[in-house]
């Protein structure tokens, strides 16, 4: 059995500033200011409440990796990010358990450049895997 820790819940938003304000009104605090991810063409902001972390993700262009998802699903949670101490081994284990990589592991600017990979599973949807230590 994998021993993965939940790092955050990814939340798609159309308007970053409005989403930040709404989450702050719910008692969240900004954990990390908004960061632009040039590879994925998204703005990212981390907020925290009661030990839970959410990642607000907003596309900045029509060819962003999440622009299509936002059009289809609107503002909504869309992935769970899991933290691992053994990225390569857990990545391969997830593959054998039916998770399909959407992309190759790449550095994430909003996560101190740590490698992340997004994967999908027919029964679970999308997850993100990240090296621990963030």
Regions found by a protein language model. Give the residues of each.
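Long, hydrophobic N-terminal alpha-helical segment
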Residues: 1-40
């Amino acid at each position: 059995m994998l021993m993965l820790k939940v790092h955050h819940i990814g939340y798609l938003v159309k308007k970053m500033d409005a989403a930040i304000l709404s989450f702050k009104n719910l008692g969240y605090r900004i954990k990390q200011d908004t960061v632009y991810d040039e590879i994925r063409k998204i703005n990212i902001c981390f907020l925290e409440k009661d030990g839970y972390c959410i990642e607000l993700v907003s596309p900045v262009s029509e060819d962003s990796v999440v622009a299509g998802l936002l059009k289809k699903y609107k503002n909504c949670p869309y992935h769970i990010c899991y933290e691992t101490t053994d990225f390569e081994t857990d990545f391969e284990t997830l593959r054998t358990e039916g998770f399909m990589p959407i992309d190759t592991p790449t550095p994430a600017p909003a996560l101190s450049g740590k490698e992340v990979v997004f994967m999908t599973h027919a029964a679970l949807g999308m997850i993100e895997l990240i090296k621990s230590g963030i």
